[in-house]
Amino acid sequence: MNIFDTSTNSKTSRLSKTIKNIPLFEIVSIEYEFFDISITDIIFQSVAAVENFKHFEACNEINVFAMGESTKQTLKDMGINAKIPKTPGSLGLKELLGEDLAERKFVIVKGLGGLDEAHNHIIKYGGLVENLICYKRKEFSNYDVMRKQFSEADAVIFSSTYAARIFFENIYIDNSNVSFMCISERVKEYVKNLGYEAKTINYFSEDLVDEVKKAI
């Protein structure tokens, strides 16, 4: 079975030699100004947010949150413990943050065009918040080689709606016998709205290959 993972986090490829990691876009760092507002909380929305952030001293003695398991692990590798929601993603994070946010000052580390749900939630419940944009996603200029690679896929894993959009616009050949797997309900709904069937899998399973096989 040929399984293709579109995540830009190449560390996922360690999970199995069966899974081929082929990112559909690149991550480009953006210079930023750090908003030192005596913050009480910092949120990292992605692995790329961690990898392109430079002021980790700010994480000392404050609350650190990560959107999901991969982001938490990336922070842990740097010696930083982060809290994560039971359900990865914005909805789970909002539940974890709760509604008693007055007197708290947040910085959200994210990419250009990243989700604003956590930002809006904090404002709604009286917290102060600044977005810190430290990277952007950039499409490749040509997908001809990837189109040939993906023609051999039995299953494709989408870790973001951005990757899914690029795939269906530049790579997918109609009537291909391939199954689509998504790491969250949000990504699955996006793929379904494009007119394709998809299933949500536990991306952080101990055996991701088995997880994919059971979903097909």
Residues covered by each model-derived region:
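Signature of uroporphyrinogen-III synthase
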Residues: 1-216
